[in-house]
Amino acid sequence: VHRRLLRFFSLLLCGVAAATAATVVAPSSNPEVEVSAVKFANLRAPHGSSGNWYEATIALDVRPVPSTSGRMVARVRVTLTLGFELPAPPGGERRMEFYRAEAECVALETGRSDVRFYLPPELVKRDQLHGDPKYWGVELAAAGRAIPAGRGSYASSLPAAEARKSFQTRAAAGAGINEGLLQPQFLTPFALEYARATPSFVRRESR
């Protein structure tokens, strides 16, 4: 009987330890911020300016943890990377153009928030940009902590982790020559548009 009791308690302790370990390592299935949709459009800027801008709208689903102060997620950084495959010029080859920009939100409340980026009309006209880019990806971080990519964070042309990593590597090497061309909303003529759906941004441009 004594041996049976020892065996029972030993198995019980092992089960508790395993359950505890599983609880500790299990990843959260509900990140604080997640990309729910990304849409692209061509549109004219307000106040009668000429030429179409290329707009990328990133819809974010925000779910602060219950213990978060004010039920907000602070300092959310959104980085958008675009990869366009452009037609070949006469006698040439098709080429890729990469653009990257980021914007940091002061804080996001529970619910939906939209973050927008724009390419100016000169590029839209020169490269005939319209529709979805061939490749795109969105990276998120909150208070300096990277948030794992969700299902809506990348284009359908990048279904696998290896393809996404390759895209980010190529973009890191190729986006430098286009630095500053993809612009967050607050640096464009659309700064005062979508007032109800636009969060406040951290501003770091030189004065």
Task: Enumerate the language-model features and the residues they cover.
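A structural detector for beta-sheet-dominated domains
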Residues: 41, 63, 118-120, 141
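Hydrophobic h-region of N-terminal signal peptides that target proteins for export
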Residues: 12-22
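Surface-exposed extracytoplasmic segments
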Residues: 63, 67-68, 143, 163-166, ...
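Bacterial N-terminal signal peptides that target proteins for export
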Residues: 1-12
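Internal, hydrophobic beta-strand segments that form the core of beta-sheet-rich folds
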Residues: 76-83, 122-173
